[in-house]
Amino acid sequence: MKRTKLTKMPPLRKASPQTPPGFHLLVKPSGAACNLDCKYCFFLSKEMLYPGSNIRMTDEMLRIYIRQSLDSQQTSEISINWQGGEPTLMGLNFFRRSVDYVEKFKSPGQPVLYTIQTNGTKIDKDWAAFLKQHNFLELEYGWTKGIS
């Protein structure tokens, strides 16, 4: 399969009348990769779909995703929801860049809500400060005795 590098983003269209007034997108920047092996996880075997690969959201794709997400919303409030696998495996700098792109591409005064679903194992003082600074409204985490 031939891959084309996206060096320039295509011009964006205004949202059409058929576009729903608002929607939530779930972003899985690390794909199925996770640092735990919870038996209950429905996503557990998905990493095996691409054996030997390291599928991750590139910085270029992050920039395109953020811009198109912000431009396509018809509501004043935008929601960006990070999931995985384990999204924190992308590293704190990835999320710093995502917030930078949001600030660059959002409309003036446009509120953006962030959530992240994580197992919490990578959350340290730096992560906690970042999440607090950028008002991540939800920090969902969970594991059970079934972790192996």
PLM regions: where:
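Radical SAM/AdoMet-radical enzyme domain recognition
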Residues: 66-67, 71-81, 90-148
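Short, motif-level signal for alpha-helix interfacial/capping segments enriched in acidic residues
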Residues: 12-15, 57-65
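Flexible, acidic/Gly-rich N-terminal and inter-domain linker regions that tether
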Residues: 1-24, 36-40, 68
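Short glycine-centered, acidic/aromatic-flanked micro-motifs in structured strand/loop junctions
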Residues: 29, 84-85, 118
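Conserved, mostly hydrophobic/aromatic
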Residues: 34, 38, 82, 116
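Short, charged low-complexity linear motifs
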Residues: 25-28, 62-72
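Conserved non-cysteine loop/helix-boundary elements of the Radical SAM core domain that shape
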Residues: 46-61, 85-94, 122, 148
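Canonical Radical SAM [4Fe-4S] cluster-binding loop centered on the CxxxCxxC motif
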Residues: 19-60
